[in-house]
Amino acid sequence: MKNRYIQQFEDAQLKDKTMPIFKAGDTLKLGITIKEGEKTRTQYFEGVCIAIRGNGVDKTFCVRKIGANNIGVEKIFPFYSESLASVEVLRVGRVRRAKLYYLRDRRGKAARIKEVRH
């Protein structure tokens, strides 16, 4: 059980930021704010969400993309991070698992995820 002051602080943090609803298998485009000296810029990272873990303020999600020379790049982001400028859901994937770590072993077309049709 958490201290009530900690709980009040966490509740206030959760109210400040809204996130789109997404799950593992969805393709996301994340805008990450990067500060270099006095300048700030937004760098975009696009990939598949392969895991969501935790809850409340401590909730995180992992996004995987295939970079240059077919090298996989995974980044873990806190849900309520100040560095996340924007989160956009590009595609809704149809998967039957909560954690898609098996995509690490797949290459090419085997790593594709079916899209939900409406």
Curated annotation (Swiss-Prot):
InterPro entries: Ribosomal_bL19 (IPR001857), Ribosomal_bL19_CS (IPR018257), Ribosomal_bL19_sf (IPR038657), Translation_prot_SH3-like_sf (IPR008991). One of its GO terms (biological process) is translation. It comes from the Bacteria. Transmembrane segments: none annotated. GO terms for cellular component: cytosolic large ribosomal subunit. GO terms for molecular function: structural constituent of ribosome. The keyword Nucleus does not apply. Pfam families: Ribosomal_L19. Gene3D superfamilies: 2.30.30.790. Keywords: Ribonucleoprotein, Ribosomal protein. HAMAP family: Ribosomal_bL19. This protein is located at the 30S-50S ribosomal subunit interface and may play a role in the structure and function of the aminoacyl-tRNA binding site. Belongs to the bacterial ribosomal protein bL19 family. This is Large ribosomal subunit protein bL19. It comes from Helicobacter pylori (strain P12). The lineage of its organism: Bacteria, Pseudomonadati, Campylobacterota, Epsilonproteobacteria, Campylobacterales. The gene is rplS.
